[in-house]
């Protein structure tokens, strides 16, 4: 089972290896946990900042999911990308940290918090599984750069990573406040999902507005947005969501960018329906 909407690259990877991939619904608290998940072998989830909505799974639901996994012999793949990128409240313990029965495979990366070009990730799982994964990795790449790994280890041990996360959190808090305020002023007809971290926001467009068409029109105004269709298992009927990224954008241009987005949206709403 995989979240729907969810991370498209994970869905594509799994789809290449199985015909039994099933979309699982989410709500304002992330993956919906219930009896519908009991018959799966694996559940893939992004609990810290759900991709693409950005919502955070609360502790009570994490405990509920772990209980279901224990009772039903299910393995959870916890993709905890952007877990450090919080600007509101305190981080919730990872599923893996709550796992008492080795039901969770924890996957993380430093590409979001450090640099996209730093292709270093990590997995926390049972030692037997790690041994198998190391053997499989060797068939693809002998090993990641030892120099980069040692440099990163030193960077973390000296406390520089903690300082980097603090700077990142402060910057994203400022930018998220700016984009939320601008959307409320310029595009009140949109519904924006509340967020507590991450570098993007999930926006539901007014009825009748195509995300794909809006993306093309906004591009002509110098604004790049990501249509939400790609995040759904079936794009049909789900073409009215967009994801707006702000992590790599200067705070000084966010207001003007949202104003242009709203102008493009207004143009689309004036167009006659097909």
Where do the language-model regions lie?
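Conserved core of the PLP fold type I
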Residues: 1-72, 84-85, 90-98, 172, ...
């Amino acid at each position: 089972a995989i979240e729907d909407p969810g991370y498209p690259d994970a869905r594509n990877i799994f789809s290449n290896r199985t015909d039994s991939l099933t979309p699982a619904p989410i709500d304002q608290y992330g993956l919906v946990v219930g009896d519908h998940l009991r018959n799966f072998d694996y559940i893939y989830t992004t609990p810290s900042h759900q991709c693409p909505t950005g919502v955070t799974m609360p502790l009570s639901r994490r405990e509920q999911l772990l209980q279901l996994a224990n009772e039903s012999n299910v393995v959870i793949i916890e993709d905890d990308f952007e877990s450090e990128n919080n600007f509101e409240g305190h981080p919730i313990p990872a599923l893996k940290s709550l796992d008492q029965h080795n039901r969770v495979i924890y996957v993380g990366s430093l590409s979001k918090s450090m640099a996209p070009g730093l292709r270093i990730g990590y997995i926390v799982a049972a030692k037997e599984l790690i041994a198998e994964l190391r053997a499989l990795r060797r068939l693809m790449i002998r090993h990641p750069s030892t120099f980069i790994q040692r440099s990163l280890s030193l960077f973390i041990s000296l406390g520089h990573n903690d300082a980097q996360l603090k700077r990142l959190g402060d910057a994203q808090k400022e930018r998220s406040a700016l984009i939320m305020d601008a959307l409320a002023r310029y595009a009140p007809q949109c519904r924006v999902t509340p967020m507590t971290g991450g570098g993007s926001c999930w926006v539901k467009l007014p009825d009748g507005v195509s995300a794909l068409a809006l993306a093309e029109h906004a591009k002509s105004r110098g604004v790049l947005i990501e249509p939400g269709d790609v995040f759904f298992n079936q794009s049909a009927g789900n073409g009215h969501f967009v994801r707006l990224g702000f992590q790599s954008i200067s705070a000084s241009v966010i207001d003007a960018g949202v104003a242009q987005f709203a102008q493009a949206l207004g143009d689309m709403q004036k167009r006659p329906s097909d």
